[in-house]
């Protein structure tokens, strides 16, 4: 049992380090020699990179950050599909249950890693893009539905943070409608609450009517990824 727990623990540690890869920070240093955390919203996410460095770096950050979340969940599923890995499980282990639990834990670790990166003194982004990557591998139908809600709200409001919050709030309902396992529903609640909490400053600006829209040039802007 100890070896089995250790193997799963390693998967979760790797998931955290995947999530903590500081894409936006590294692009800021490489392209302009700046610390992206000292500009705009002071976030390493794709929205702040877009506003600070431009479309190309912003899209690159978005793509890599999505892959971080997707990679964390894909790694767990790959491990659980490997007979050598499964030989470490005790004979009475419910593999299906363990898989669901470790998948959601790996997803949460990747999300945490993005927003609290060990490489950046536990700072980072808002975890929206990384969370989307997790969803697309965990349940691609829910991931696409959440992306659709994000796209709809951003097209109507031009406010990225409001779109991210709307998508996060919709997750438990989408998981329930898609009849996903209870573990995935619990993940959607936990991840959704965390993403909304990460947007607390944005919520205050939304209530005050000062949250910038896409295309606006603000000295202090918001980041939703």
Swiss-Prot record:
The chain crosses the membrane at residues 1-21, 56-76, 95-115, 134-154, 159-178, 182-201. It is a multi-pass membrane protein. Keywords: Cell inner membrane, Cell membrane, Lipid biosynthesis, Lipid metabolism, Membrane, Phospholipid biosynthesis, Phospholipid metabolism, Transferase, Transmembrane, Transmembrane helix. One of its GO terms (cellular component) is plasma membrane. Its EC number is 2.3.1.275. It holds the Pfam family G3P_acyltransf. GO terms for molecular function: acyl-phosphate glycerol-3-phosphate acyltransferase activity. Its main location: membrane. Pathway: Lipid metabolism; phospholipid metabolism. It comes from the Bacteria. GO terms for biological process: phospholipid biosynthetic process. It catalyses: an acyl phosphate + sn-glycerol 3-phosphate = a 1-acyl-sn-glycero-3-phosphate + phosphate. It is found in: Cell inner membrane. InterPro entries: G3P_acylTferase_PlsY. Belongs to the PlsY family. Catalyzes the transfer of an acyl group from acyl-phosphate (acyl-PO(4)) to glycerol-3-phosphate (G3P) to form lysophosphatidic acid (LPA). This enzyme utilizes acyl-phosphate as fatty acyl donor, but not acyl-CoA or acyl-ACP. Probably interacts with PlsX. This is Glycerol-3-phosphate acyltransferase. It comes from Acaryochloris marina (strain MBIC 11017).
